[in-house]
């Protein structure tokens, strides 16, 4: 299926079509560069459907985090039940959203990535814990299939924490507990549909 996706993208670009692809487009970095070069050659737009990054609430979350709302970020914890994620996407599609969230919050200058997959007796993948180590922070990504994983995104800072409950990949609400403040800060934004409309809005102004 992954190979078919890449082939479909290549053929569409060669025909001068704009392409919005499920993520990941390909698992090969060189192939990814080739596809973007092909898009430039044919003067069309190629984007991955990482709708999370186009949501107003998530953009605000990143802005507040980088603005030290909860101080220096020391950890980002991202958990997702694969069955709850858009009807049960495959592992690569699920982990792409989680990695995107971590990189938007902590940046691209990580030191190492480790994965710890757990399989059941018949060899089927049931759980994975991925750790991404940064110079002064740690990101953990927890993905479960048949095991109970509570969907949430938590940002732990030196002066508090921010929590995005439930289906954080459709961020519409988050709350912050800031050191020295008695009450939670709550942030709520309208969210409609599956997020695709927000990506399309961005494409309209490209």
Question: What spans do the regions from the language model cover?
Answer:
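Rossmann-fold NAD(P) dinucleotide-binding segment
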Residues: 3-22
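A general structural signal for well-ordered alpha-helical segments in protein cores
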Residues: 5-9, 32, 58, 98-99, ...
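Short, well-ordered coil/turn segments that N-cap beta-strands
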Residues: 17, 44-45, 135-137
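Hydrophobic residues in well-ordered beta-strands that form the structural core
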Residues: 21, 46-48, 164
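Contiguous beta-strand/loop segments that form the cofactor/metal-binding neighborhood of enzyme cores
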Residues: 93-171, 200-206
